[in-house]
Design a protein with these regions (language model features):
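N-proximal low-complexity "stem/linker" segments adjacent to membrane-targeting elements
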Residues: 1-25, 33
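Short, solvent-exposed loop/turn segments at secondary-structure junctions
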Residues: 10-13, 36-38, 67-70, 122-124, ...
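Short, glycine/acidic-rich beta->alpha junctions
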Residues: 11-15, 22, 99, 113, ...
Length: 189
């Protein structure tokens, strides 16, 4: 059984470096998806550079998401501010979901019993005490500390349910896993 750590990347180079170093001993592969578009649909330059992460080069599966989703709602000049806001929110979610679902291309060589971790780059699970071989649940939700954008902005008494772990055979899509709520699944810190 291998462990694939899968997430999207935008410009969080420091957090990416921290994540790779913390999870390196537990993870077999890091699946990193970077998009040529931001969530507003603007074209952007790719910034991921494998030269900055040579230590992890053999573990990194780097994918570039080139496409915009097909179901983007066109903004019209006659739309009300409310409609523009709703369409913009919808479009941003569709772009994010398409980028996250692109993770699937990095899992083509994964076996059905391999563990797939789905999260954002800044949601770093604590894998120190997790024995995936002993867990019988189909889905695991990680209970994580919440930091508001920076490591020094810890929010006490607030629990974040971020990373999801699931065997490949049970994974419908990366976004499906992301949307799972923690109500009926075991939680790990």
């Amino acid at each position: 059984m291998k462990i694939y750590d899968c997430f999207m990347f935008f410009d969080e180079e420091l957090i990416l470096d921290v994540r790779l170093n913390i999870l390196n001993e537990f993870v077999d592969y890091f699946v990193i998806v970077e998009s040529k578009y931001d969530h507003k649909g603007n074209k952007r330059e790719l910034i991921f550079n494998i030269e900055n992460y040579k230590k992890f080069e053999n573990k990194i599966i780097y994918l570039v998401h080139n496409d915009l989703p097909y179901n983007i709602k066109k903004l019209n000049k006659r739309d009300s501010k409310n409609t523009i806001g709703l369409k913009s929110f919808h479009n941003a979610n569709e772009r994010e979901n398409a980028q996250r679902n692109f993770i699937s291309y990095g899992l083509k060589d994964a076996d059905n019993e391999d563990i797939i971790l789905i999260s954002d780059v800044d949601e770093i699970p604590n894998l120190d005490s997790v024995d995936f071989d002993k867990i019988k649940s189909k889905i695991i939700v990680f209970e994580q500390k919440f930091f508001n954008y920076k490591f020094d902005l810890y929010v006490p008494n607030f629990t974040w349910f971020g990373t999801k772990a699931i065997k490949k055979k049970n994974l419908k899509s990366p976004q499906w896993a992301r949307n799972i709520k923690c109500k009926k699944y075991p939680k790990y810190r």
